[in-house]
């Protein structure tokens, strides 16, 4: 994948390594694109790993005007190039929804670099229900603009009782999201890239270990999508959270973090040990 000079300058946020040669974990958010999505995971991850967060191209502190044909492959290529420029050659990926798609693309295109993948509420190709949800959200965007999109978004991310107990927090988050809205064109081009992505014929070529985490009450992405992903991948394990919704890492971080840390410890460290034995 060819990267333009502007794309090559994508900014990353790197935590200090907790010890020499600490494994690197790259966090990739979903359609919103903001690295701050992973705030509930940072403190625990940074104790064991060097953590990379970033705002995706066209969002936050990486502003840009995206091409109409912008793709998941481009998202993967520009991230990999930014990591290489930062001196990072091997890394694990934790991706949420769209971020999980980018993670799979990285594993396919740069197999020598990706040590492990964690897919959070991801999929092989977009499910009919997920497509329907996005059609409704697109209609809201076209008819009501950014404010309608932002105000509807929590309905697809969080369980109803969790939202009801946190109304002031959600109002504050809505205001922040509206102030930092990525723009209609960029959002639609990123969404179209998500909808076009199809790994159903390529997932069996992903050789790194994959941890799959999903929530059974996810309104946007049915948990069956993670089951299909699990069946298609050669080396994967699947964990199901009974509660948490699409943004389960935000709504139930204690449970999610425990699953994530255990998965990284068992799969990533096992893979690294095996690689060292081969050297």
Curated annotation (Swiss-Prot):
Entry keyword annotation includes Hydrolase: yes
Gene3D superfamilies: alpha/beta hydrolase
Biological process, per Gene Ontology: nitrogen utilization; uracil catabolic process
EC numbers, comma separated: 3.5.1.-
Disulfide bonding pattern of the chain: none
UniProt domain AB hydrolase-1: residue ranges: 23-126
Keywords from the named record: Hydrolase
One GO molecular-function entry: hydrolase activity, acting on carbon-nitrogen (but not peptide) bonds, in linear amides
EC main group: hydrolase
Role: Involved in pyrimidine catabolism. May facilitate the hydrolysis of carbamate, a reaction that can also occur spontaneously.
Organism listed in the record: Escherichia coli O17:K52:H18 (strain UMN026 / ExPEC)
Identification of the protein by name: Putative carbamate hydrolase RutD
Family note: Belongs to the AB hydrolase superfamily. Hydrolase RutD family.
Catalysed reactions, as listed in the record: carbamate + 2 H(+) = NH4(+) + CO2
GO CC annotation terms, alphabetical: membrane
